Amino acid sequence: LIVQLLGAARIYAAEDPSYEKIALVYRAHGASLELLPLGADGIRSDALAATRASVLHITPYRSYPSNVTASAAKRREYIRWASEPGRYIVEDDFSSEFTVASKPEETVFSLAESGNVIYLNTFSQTVAPSLRMGYMVLSEKLAAQYAERIGFYSCTVPLFEQLVLAEL
């Protein structure tokens, strides 16, 4: 959906290492992908500055398989990077709800004001693994673009499961 929303002609970037299927999905949809090396607190600054990508796919909390969590400074660096026209961040936040801290990490989506962060999450870890439901949060601008370009898709999650989740 991300490639269909933003376009395959862009260069995408993802963390290295990252969940192997991220690269497979982008490439399967015809997107060029750069892998950016992780440091102790997120993508290395030199690699981020040098990338030709216009879309950055990040897992800022406990990135898999490295278990690296992006620092607050690194999250701000990602937002600064995305402040250039035509740049986007895809924030894949699959496990931030599970934290030993009293307060979960702030998402890049919640910190960015530009409307160019796409937030992805799932209910598989917080509610039940058998509920294979994810969700995407878009800014108003991106939601309008979604409706125009790929709004014809229908939901693949059975209605019964959606209703059960809504009651929780």
Region spans (language model):
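Conserved Walker B
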Residues: 93-95
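PLP-dependent aminotransferase class I/II
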Residues: 118-168
